């Protein structure tokens, strides 16, 4: 079961993985719940930095 955010990111509830619509990469969330902030809906993941709407890296 997956959760799709307004920005296109998807969060898989069972595996805890996040998929990026921009790069196609899959990020590990290490079991952390999705995070809401910065005026955008972004899940936890390990993308380095916050540029042009890309989410921060949350640990």
Curated annotation (Swiss-Prot):
The modification Pyrrolidone carboxylic acid is found at residue 1. Keywords: Cuticle, Pyrrolidone carboxylic acid. GO terms for molecular function: structural constituent of cuticle. It comes from the Eukaryota. Pfam families: Cuticle_2. InterPro entries: Cuticle_2. This is Cuticle protein 7 isoform c. It comes from Limulus polyphemus (Atlantic horseshoe crab).
């Amino acid at each position: 079961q997956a959760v799709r955010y307004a920005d296109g990111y998807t969060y898989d509830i069972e595996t805890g993985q996040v998929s990026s619509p921009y790069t196609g990469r899959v990020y590990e969330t290490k079991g952390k719940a999705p995070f809401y902030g910065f005026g955008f809906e972004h899940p936890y993941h390990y993308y380095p930095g916050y540029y042009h709407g890309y989410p921060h890296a949350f640990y």
